[in-house]
Design a protein with these regions (language model features):
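Extracytoplasmic/periplasmic ligand-binding sensor regions of membrane-associated signaling proteins
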Residues: 32, 36-144
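Flexible, glycine-rich terminal cap/loop adjacent to redox cofactors
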Residues: 147
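Alpha-helical transmembrane helix bundles of large polytopic membrane transport and channel proteins
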Residues: 1-30
Length: 147
């Protein structure tokens, strides 16, 4: 994600978020009427309920350029590029590429537990899949579980 966009999103959703580390997901949306904030306000409560109901730790959405455009928990990997940024060689970077490079939108990739830096080194496993419109991949999605 471009530096200015990354900095603005991390400032709004991590640094200026009134909730403490580990509870950043409680903010429905940052102040302001940007398209991102309006969309966050509309969909974030649903993703948060879905995450809790299914027992996930986090849910991620990526565009095909590798930008982490959405995360329920907004940790250090939020708003970064998994193709070029600091987490490109991370476990999450590998899971993004598995989804983006999958030969079919039906393919689901599973990744076993191992320490994940942006989650403060806690063991994490991931499930990744393309998000397709018919047969054309539009985005990639990822679910994170913690041990």
């Amino acid at each position: 994600m471009p530096g200015a966009r990354k900095a603005a999103l991390q400032k709004a959703y991590i640094e200026d978020n009134p909730h403490p580390t580990g509870k950043k997901e409680q903010l429905d949306a940052a102040d302001g009427g940007t398209f991102y904030n309006v969309t966050q306000r509309k969909y974030h409560p649903w993703f948060r309920r879905f995450l809790r109901a299914r027992g996930y730790y986090d849910i991620f959405l990526f565009n095909l350029d590798g930008n982490l455009t959405y995360s329920v928990f907004k940790e250090l990997d939020y708003a970064t590029s998994l193709n070029t940024g600091e987490w490109k060689d991370s476990y999450l970077g590998n899971t993004f590429r598995a989804a983006a490079d999958a030969s079919s939108p039906e393919k689901v990739s599973f990744f076993d537990f191992k320490p994940y830096g942006p989650s403060y080194g806690a063991p994490a496993s991931f499930i990744s899949k393309q998000i397709a419109d018919g047969t054309e991949c539009r985005n990639a999605g990822n679910f994170q579980k913690r041990a």
